[in-house]
């Protein structure tokens, strides 16, 4: 089948773009949106027996109220290190350690802080779009090389480039939708 290598390139580009969008999704989850969410602590690491360990491996994290996160360590001896890890993550949160669990009150966001968070979200979206464009560029170059090497017609090249652009547009729309959704969450008082 003459267009198999081209289809492989398109599939690979689609996969890589999806990975970029997926990474953006996880980044946006860690950006605070007014109410408490365990995802806010997703990137926190804790020193546990001499190595940096993700928080979710040493404690359970829950948000029993819209303005409170509770961290329940699996090992009580790790509670101080967990508290230190949360402070080091520089999330602007003040954990309260009662010896058994850590309570983290989530203060309401000021208008200024909301705008900063929206800007951070926009930056993440722009980084993702740049990544998608770079993947498109690389795939386009690969397609051109295959077309030249296999002596395919110009029509095959244009068709493949159109398909690649459609894939790119779909992922870019997803990024825009995620950004819009996050902006609404942040600005919703």
Swiss-Prot record:
GO biological process: translational termination
Compartment annotation: Cytoplasm
SUPFAM superfamilies on file: Ribosome recycling factor, RRF
Source superkingdom: Bacteria
Single annotated GO MF: ribosomal large subunit binding
Major location (coarse): cytoplasm
Keyword terms, alphabetized: Cytoplasm, Protein biosynthesis
Signal sequence coordinates: none
InterPro entries from the UniProt entry: Ribosome_recyc_fac, Ribosome_recyc_fac_dom, RRF_sf
GO annotation, cellular component aspect: cytoplasm
Annotated function: Responsible for the release of ribosomes from messenger RNA at the termination of protein biosynthesis. May increase the efficiency of translation by recycling ribosomes from one round of translation to another.
PANTHER family reported for this sequence: MITOCHONDRIAL RIBOSOME RECYCLING FACTOR PSEUDO 1, RIBOSOME RECYCLING FACTOR
Family to which this protein belongs: Belongs to the RRF family.
Protein name (record): Ribosome-recycling factor
Species of provenance: Salinibacter ruber (strain DSM 13855 / M31)
Lineage of producing organism: Bacteria, Pseudomonadati, Rhodothermota, Rhodothermia, Rhodothermales
Gene it is expressed from: frr
């Amino acid at each position: 089948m003459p267009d198999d290598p081209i289809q492989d390139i398109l599939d690979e580009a689609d996969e890589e773009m999806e990975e970029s969008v997926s990474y953006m999704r996880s980044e946006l989850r860690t950006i605070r949106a007014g109410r408490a969410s365990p995802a806010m602590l997703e990137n926190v690491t804790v020193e546990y027996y001499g190595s940096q360990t993700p928080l979710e491996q040493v404690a359970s994290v829950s948000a029993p109220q819209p303005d409170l996160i509770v961290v329940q360590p699996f090992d009580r001896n790790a509670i101080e290190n967990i508290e230190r890890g949360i402070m080091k993550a520089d999330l602007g949160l003040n954990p309260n350690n009662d010896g058994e669990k850590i309570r983290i009150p989530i203060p309401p966001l000021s208008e200024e802080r909301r705008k900063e968070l929206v800007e951070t979200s926009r930056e993440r979206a722009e980084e993702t779009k740049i990544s998608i464009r770079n993947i498109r560029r690389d795939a386009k170059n690969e397609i051109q090389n295959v077309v030249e090497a296999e002596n395919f017609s110009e029509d095959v090249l244009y068709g493949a480039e159109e398909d690649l652009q459609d894939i790119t547009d779909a992922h870019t729309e997803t990024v825009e939708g995620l950004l819009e959704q996050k902006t609404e969450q942040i600005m919703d008082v």
